[in-house]
Amino acid sequence: MNVYTTAPLEDPREARTIYRELEDIGYDGGFSFEAKHDPFLTLAVAAEHTRHLRLGTAIAIAFARNPMNLANLGYDMQSISGGRFVLGLGSQVKPHIEKRFSGVWSHPAERMTEIVKAIKAIWACWEGKAPLKFEGRFYRHTIMIPAFNPGPNPYGLPPIFTGGFGPLMTAAAGEAADGFIAHPFNSRRSLLENALPALQKGLAKSGRRRSDLEIMCATLVVTANTE
């Protein structure tokens, strides 16, 4: 088991000191999330000021971006961090996608599954494993010229985690992602009775085993000077 934490920042310039402090304290990983600041830029700063802390987004909003954009971000963050990056994606909720990001909300679980598969298809092209020919219901990526191909990543590919709460989005993580990020509003009962069966359903759909999926369980913690 690893112990991670999120690092909410009021000022993005704090990333250089806060993530270094997390590493010094002994955390295994420090994660950003999409709130007041861009979750990727703060981690790029953190990567330059840490040595072994695992870094990731938990979560970056997938539906506010497209698979090619996310593929570039994940690939570059893996290089900048020296192989320590986790691309953590989530859907947000319909009002935020439509009214805050002016995006499209439809078939969220199916769309999330397709985003992950599209990113992996793009990475496979860059790694020289297959030509780019991804044609899905929501996204199409069928052209890649040498000028836009960064080539194989010297640190390998970053894992893709997706967040979920309901059964369909949770099953989507089991089907396509490398890891699942449980919503902070969870309990032991909800994980055992709802999340794990949904993950297993998704794993079975893609012919994978439970050992193929990492689970990151978020927990809300309140501390004070006296406790």
Question: Each predicted region: which residue ranges?
Answer:
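Active-site-adjacent structural elements that line small-molecule/cofactor binding pockets in enzymes
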Residues: 1-227
